[in-house]
Swiss-Prot record:
It is found in: Nucleus. It comes from Schizosaccharomyces pombe (strain 972 / ATCC 24843). The long N-terminal helix forms part of the 'assembly lobe' of the SAGA deubiquitination module. This is SAGA complex subunit Sgf11. GO terms for molecular function: transcription coactivator activity; zinc ion binding.
Length: 117
């Protein structure tokens, strides 16, 4: 059966590409699933299996949840801040963010220029 129009040809090409891609993807997933069940010939362990323990990622590393993220007390306002946000908070808390420092220095330079004239 020959497609009569450009749309028919395009649809046929797309269907063939999609079928080939889907077939290749399912074969790859099936192969990886089968290999993950076998023991590794080098170390005689299940190296390819994913960790399924709760609280761990797929590699077996502990996942930090909000309850076990370390918190530090701010030196200025004494609030508890997460370790990942501490530097940014301290910078804002002291009022020395880059934008503020730049604007203050330009204002200071402008004032000095006016006094010299």
């Amino acid at each position: 059966m020959q497609p009569a129009s450009l749309a028919g040809i395009s649809c046929t090409i797309f269907e063939n590409l999609l079928k080939d891609y889907t077939h290749e993807l399912t074969q790859t997933v099936h192969k990886n699933a089968k290999l993950s069940l076998q023991k590794c010939p080098a170390c005689n362990k299940h190296c390819r299996q994913y960790c399924t323990k709760p609280g761990y990622d797929i590699y077996g590393n502990s996942v930090q949840t909000p309850s076990n993220v370390p918190y530090y007390s701010c030196l200025m306002c004494k609030r508890e801040i997460a370790a990942s946000r501490y530097a940014a908070h301290l910078e804002k808390c002291k009022g020395r963010s880059l934008s503020n420092a730049t604007s203050y220095s330009t204002l200071f330079e402008d004032d000095n220029a006016d006094e010299e004239d």
